[in-house]
Amino acid sequence: MYSTNDKPCEDICFDEAHINKVVAEILKNFEPYFINFVETSAGSTISLEQFKELQKKFGSSSSIQKSSVDYTKSLKDIFQKSIDSFEKDREKYIELLDEDNLSEYQYDPTQFKSQALHNECPIIRGTLMNTKAKELDRYRKDFKRADPNNLLQVVMNLSDFGHSYQKNYYNPDNYLKITSFKDLNMELLDTDDYTYYGVIGGGIKTLMLYKLDPEVFSYRSKSAIWSLYYLTNKKVIDCRQDSEFLIIDVKKVITKQNYFYPYQLFAKYAFEVFKLLNNKAKELNVYLNPQYRYVIVDAFFEHIAKIHETEISELSHELKEDGYGYGTMGF
């Protein structure tokens, strides 16, 4: 568990042997979450286990049976619904990261800030408009003070990285054979050139890239980091303090997801989770379109966080959030 004054994570977290241990732990805990994911249609119904518990609780006749789940149909439905949801506001992000549009804004960065970011970027607009959430007051202040030129430059850098990644780094024939996080080539996204602290942090910038190209970019959301905490069974693996996926707010004395967690490491674990999901899909004769690779991963992460939402709320003492988890999800 990390103080807000500490580094994003301990040095051991970048060690390949450590990463292999984390992946092994994820593998051990994956199956029950996947079964629940499919049996409940990603949380839209109850699982067989939950059905039996309700029967016991209310003394219902054991002759009443829950319909068996067609795993193949359920996974297909989950994937299609996830894509449909993903696409709803995707065009807004594609327009935001359009290189020609960004070039035009170089003549008027203030317009970029007030129009493209404030009014047209869904996650930023939603955050700024959510005035009931007092914990977002600081974000609103930081956005108001943010320099338009620097904001534009960060988004231009993200756009350039996002549009050039497939050409520079991605080989679809060898992608699933990658073993080291370094070979995913995401380390630049953890640098200052791709961050505007307080306004465009790990959550927002990875959402932008995820919406641009979910074939290669995973979304490092609040739910995703929490889900890795649970997929590793809350274990402390090699670290001196506590789980690398948690952070302690010293001033408020509350536990949150590690919103400083390096994207280059997160991308590796999201990649490994995709491989597990893809293997299950093959067993069920379900095709997961690689162009939407990380959409199914995000849906899985969201489901795990939903399962544990009561405990997460108790740990973080935060108000329930809407949409993308506006708040400390990585600004």
What would you call each of these model-derived segments?
Residues 1-196, 215-225, 229-331:
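An N-terminal alpha-helical hairpin/helix-loop-helix interaction module that forms a charged
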Residues 204-210:
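Short, small-residue alpha-helix embedded
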